[in-house]
Amino acid sequence: MHPHLQTRMVEFPVEGGGTASAFEARPSGAGPCPGVILVQEWWGLNDHIKDVAQRLAGEDFVVLAPDLYRGKVTQDPNQASAWMAALDREEALRILLGALRFFQEKEPIYAEHIGVVGFCMGGSYALLLACRAPALKAAIPFYGDLPDPIDQMKTIRCPVLFIAGGKDRWINSAKVQKLKEAFHLFGVHGEVRIYPDADHAFFNDTRPDVYNPAAAQDAWTRALGLLSRMLKS
């Protein structure tokens, strides 16, 4: 852990009853900071996502990475696929909305300075959360799927930066085109950034089979730029 950061697991209430947990990372000794909800890949709340949370915290954000699988983590793609398929969409959104409310209550001065970033499965949920949470000021889905039905996007009120790789067979050119059309149709302030030589999950530096350093660095710079403009002003 970076010496100038504080990390811990926190617990928060979820609408409808019960609680959920999240990995929290924040600058040490700093006053209130804007918030970022960070949504995991299909592997679970693993060390890579915790590392990304700390990288964001190093840029003066308070980061909450909710544990959508409630403690389960895997490196097996078949297991990850099964867990993702079994995850109830509405329950996952209740957890994410609970994390959002938790931050708003803990950091009231920045209650309207919150963004969401997600990767892979988390990218899909980042876009869905933007559909459900008008309080968000920025949404940055990395190679996530589109909301189904797509007309949910008409409720998005924040800028969206959608990032994907040109070699991605899951988030393919047809889906990207559908997203662009939805941005236009529903009046969403959306930007799509495609890296032609990058594959799905190109940001994950723990996966040498797909990690693309140049694309990852450029995407990170653009993501930080949007978060800073929308959350720190």
Per-region residue spans from a language model:
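C-terminal catalytic histidine-bearing segment of alpha/beta-hydrolase fold enzymes
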Residues: F186-S233
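Hydrophobic residues in well-ordered beta-strands that form the structural core
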Residues: L64-A65, P141, V192
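Serine-hydrolase catalytic machinery in alpha/beta-hydrolase-like enzymes
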Residues: M1-H2, M9-I109, F202-N204
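Short alpha-helix in the alpha/beta-hydrolase fold that links the catalytic acid
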Residues: N172-A182
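Short beta-strand/loop motif that positions the catalytic acidic residue
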Residues: I156, F162-A164, D168
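Primarily recognizes the serine-hydrolase "nucleophile elbow" in alpha/beta-hydrolase
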Residues: L97-R157
